[in-house]
Amino acid sequence: MSVAEQIRTIAAEARQASFAMAKLSSAAKDQLLLDMALALINAAPHIIEENKKDLEAGQKRGLSAAMLDRLMLDEARVKGMADAIREVAQLPDPVGEVTGMWKRPNDLMVGKMRIPLGVIGIIYESRPNVTSDAAALCLKSGNAVVLRGGSEAIHSNLAIATILKAQLAKHGIPAAALSLIPFVEREGVTEMLKQEEFIDVIIPRGGESLIRFVVENSKIPVIKHYKGVCHIFVDATADFEMAREIIVNAKTQRPGVCNALETLLIHKDIAETFVPFIYEALTTLKVELRGDKTFRQFAPKAAKATEEDWYAEYLELILAAAVVDGLDAAIDHINRYSSLHTESIITGDYANSQRFIREVNSGVVMVNASTRFSDGNQLGLGAEIGISTTKLHSFGPMGLTDLTTTKFIVYGSGQVRP
């Protein structure tokens, strides 16, 4: 069969498997996930060996340190993947939940019940842990899933998917409930995006070019998981030590992830003292700062920021920085350049914090906290499918509930419409 025919078959079989998934009890799904987690732990040496093939190929291709970090699996990360699956198993099952019930004047009882989306297609790059995270979330929420990982992680993804699929068979569940498209060529993505008859939604996670390609070519509704151009605004009333700790954590703890800080905005009234203070703290940690004209007045050794820097997701120890006139200017800057991921304000002014929360247009908005908390586990969702930068059908970190929709249920006692 051609690539197109094989992908159509994968999608069609996933559609059939989705009906079986939707009928599974919570207990059956939870036991499946627990067995999947154990299988990953037992197969860790094999997964790590396959991952080494991807790392070696990535080094030969000249992948950046950030990309290689995303790609790398060791024993601790495999354990983390298994732990994430176990956490999903412990979460309440949203399927079948009645979210509201009301009585009509004619005594009809009307309600809304949560149901699976059906078949979810996920297209992603670099991180092999997405394979297990996505599988766990989709299966727990009663969906089938079709995965298409990046070519740079093909050996890792195939190893993980094969281990997980084996558990489906042991539980008497159609193996097609979890499929990984094995083709690394772009044609595999193109054909997947044509399967609107079988796939209900596409969730792309990756760089700008991938997101744009999916949006422009998909016949299926898309929930974008775009890059993370995350901002922190240091207000005039900010505590300097708090600000330093938050900024250092947000930028340096793990710079190669989408919730790391990429642009720092500083209120002009504190620039003279705060800019040198934070410049020293960050450069000591080997962060390169690229500042606007005013920032560089107080930190002359900083590089000059260009217009492109305000849009940049560096994913490394580089930070764009600007001095702004105040809260209005900070909000305007964020709403202009943000990728709608995560933004934070550091302030001692309650009124300013509330304005920031109301007026900043991103999926996660924080007060006096590191952007690194923008994560499903950290926010109490369990493992996440990703962080949506699309307002429909979900916005921000997507957990189990976001992989369901609702249908109306109506109870009558013989009513007919007059």
UniProtKB/Swiss-Prot annotation:
The keyword Amino-acid biosynthesis applies. Its main location: cytoplasm. It comes from the Bacteria. It is found in: Cytoplasm. One of its GO terms (cellular component) is cytoplasm. One of its GO terms (molecular function) is glutamate-5-semialdehyde dehydrogenase activity. GO terms for biological process: L-proline biosynthetic process. PROSITE patterns: PROA. It catalyses: L-glutamate 5-semialdehyde + phosphate + NADP(+) = L-glutamyl 5-phosphate + NADPH + H(+). Keywords: Amino-acid biosynthesis, Cytoplasm, NADP, Oxidoreductase, Proline biosynthesis. InterPro entries: Ald_DH/histidinol_DH, Ald_DH_C, Ald_DH_N, Aldehyde_DH_dom, G-glutamylP_reductase_CS, Glu-5-SA_DH, GPR_dom. Pathway: Amino-acid biosynthesis; L-proline biosynthesis; L-glutamate 5-semialdehyde from L-glutamate: step 2/2. The keyword Amino-acid biosynthesis applies. Its EC number is 1.2.1.41. HAMAP family: ProA (MF_00412). Belongs to the gamma-glutamyl phosphate reductase family. Catalyzes the NADPH-dependent reduction of L-glutamate 5-phosphate into L-glutamate 5-semialdehyde and phosphate. The product spontaneously undergoes cyclization to form 1-pyrroline-5-carboxylate. This is Gamma-glutamyl phosphate reductase. It comes from Geobacter sp. (strain M21).
